[in-house]
Amino acid sequence: MTREDQIARVIDENTGQRAVQFKNFLSLLGIGEEAANDYIRSRHDRPATGLSASQKRGRLLAEQFIRCYNKTPDCTERYQRVAWRSLFMPTEIMYAMDIMPFTTEMAAAQFARMGRQIERMETAEENHFSQDLCSFIRTAAGAVIEDLFPTPDILVTSSHLCDPSAKFAGFASIKYKRPEFVLDIPYGIYGGVYEHDVTRIEEAVEYVAEQFKDLVGFITLHTGVEFHEERLRQVMEWSNQARKWMKTGNEFSYYEGTPVFRGSKDIDYAANLMQTWGTEKIVDVYRTRYEEFVRGAETSEPLPDRPRIHWYHLKPYYKNNLMGYIEEHAVIASNMVNSIYWDDMDPDDPFRSLARRTVMMPGYCPVSVRAKLTTQWMVEGDGIIAFYPKSCRHFHSSSRIESEIFKEANIPYLAIDGDCIDNRGDDFAVVKTRVDRFIKGLKRMKTGAGRGRQPKYVQQVFDRK
């Protein structure tokens, strides 16, 4: 069988399987296909003008989701090449080659929002997935076993931050009989403010850049899609524009403007792990977000002077009382997952630029480095809440070290042992007591001591253009 015949066979198999999987997904929700099509059309017929940033983002993600099932926004059938990607795998090369990313962890979060996650996790646990495994992965594994997700053309995974993601991709690769590509990321390349070891950084950048070139060949081999440099340059330009607006919004809301938004909702953007980098529409989403911040600061009544919190990690996506309770008594003024830690990328040197952004992620370095980096830019009087799932080995295991570093820096710190997806161990009454004590301590401090001024290190580390 020729390569062209193999690709045609995959397309034919995927087309049939995705039709069944879409019906399975709708059945889970208790929705008929005709009703679903009517809803999809009505949602996407509305002009983007006048939509909020959150609505634009939601519509973009919904459109990407249905396209993975070969559905267009007007509900016609069109085959879409799909790459399952792990949460921290860059997406620009995929968009440049007309490959739609499908992020299983994001789908797991959506299951939790709908209250459909427990059954998926139980399915996974009944099939030998351990209960102490990441709940995002368990939910996704259950969905795979129940045949709810769209069959991929390929799977692409990175090795950093999420330890079980490559193992899960290997499981899915065997299940669907589709090829997997693993991007190997060296650990601990980001060195903090001074970044002394230039040689080590450049070697890591070159190592990962060569793998991105291999990824292009992998995609062409298994999908038949040819690579065009000019298309990747355009995608990189869109990522740079989106970066500018996201970063500008972050800085305005934290240092200059009154936080008029619900910070718990802003965590939903989860920009530095999102699959929308490289799309034209995400530029408009982040621009609109910034404009909403500015407009809100100019027109809204000042909020009561409440303690301000920087949020570490993600949040519970299931229905919960925690986030609303915190925001009754404090402001979530910033968060880890929206931080923009990288420089503008060079569209004329795309592989090295993507590699540099990937290896220089502060979250994938020694705990002491990323914690001390946080101490350089936080406003005096603000505190940190770290919501760490016990199943997330990478972050949960770091809380003791972080606590000691932040205590030395006089930054109040609270680590909450929770879970983003699995609510079976949720105990709000216990957590509430700890939150009350923490916020009471923040109120005793002098809040807002440096508000409106950026510490000098922000210019050195976060404001590099």
Residue ranges and their predicted role:
Residues 172-258, 437-464:
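Cap/lid and interdomain-hinge subdomains that line or gate substrate/regulatory clefts
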Residues 368-414:
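C-terminal hydrophobic structural anchor segments
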Residues 2-14, 400-465:
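Peripheral docking tails and interdomain loops at the edges
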Residues 62-66, 70-76, 80-145, 153, ...:
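An N-terminal, globular interaction/scaffold subdomain
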Residues 84-88, 157-161, 311-316, 388-390:
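Structural motif
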Residues 139-150, 372-380:
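Short, well-structured alpha-helical segments in soluble
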Residues 2-81, 206-344:
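A charged, amphipathic alpha-helical module
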Residues 75-76, 87-88, 93-122, 307-373, ...:
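Redox- and metal-dependent alpha/beta enzyme cores, enriched for Fe-S-associated oxidoreductases
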